[in-house]
Amino acid sequence: MELQNNGHLLEINNLIKSYDGKRVVDGVCMKVKRGEVVGLLGPNGAGKTTTFYMVVGILRPDDGNIMFDGKDITKLAMYRRARNGIGYLSQEPSIFRKLTVEENIAAVLETLHLPREVRMNRLKELLEELKISHLAKKKAYMLSGGERRRLEITRALVTNPLFILLDEPFSGIDPIAVADAQEIIGELKNKGLGILLTDHNVRETLEITNHSYIMAGGKILIEGTKEVLINDPKAREIYLGEKFRM
């Protein structure tokens, strides 16, 4: 199912967050459109995780706001953001290992309080859409790393989000599974979803992003396409390194 692209969907405006008097996020601004993949990168201690968690709704900013489709969602809890169309995939494992693939998806569908026939149709649709129909009866603990990640993304799509936030989607999986995850993210983008991801795997992230932001010292150091980022002297000095190549 393709989604209509109505321009800017998610706007992060002047986010500020301090801990013990130290400002760890200092006036961060970002924009993400539907139908594009945006990366949030930076060295350890840059403030990117804190920024990402404020967008997700895990943390609340001291100042600034987060606008979703023209609506201020800064104070909304995660579950209310989900109802508004924002999906989230945590870095931590989010599947039930002893349930089958289809049971894992059905468990999320049941929280939507839909008629059984509608849930069953949606389950079949998701299995086909994410190309895991052949795994439907397989226990989750028997899945490969790539299959598990595909199931986790499928569960995040149950609520039909317009936007999805991915926390370290390439972490802890082998190169084949990384390529598979990249393919899924590309397919979601082509269907019109807006995607914001943060990951320590810089090369894998830049390979699929339309636009990325690099943070340092709590601020946005530079933003742009991968070509802009890898050719920026400051980005190389502080984060990428002089020998970085795509």
Regions found by a protein language model. Name each.
Residues 56:
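Helix-to-loop junction immediately C-terminal to a conserved catalytic motif
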Residues 117-135, 183-186:
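Conserved ABC ATPase "signature" region
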Residues 139-143, 147:
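Conserved ABC ATPase signature
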Residues 160:
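Conserved catalytic motifs of ABC-family nucleotide-binding domains
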Residues 164-168:
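Catalytic Walker B motif of ABC-type/P-loop ATPase nucleotide-binding domains
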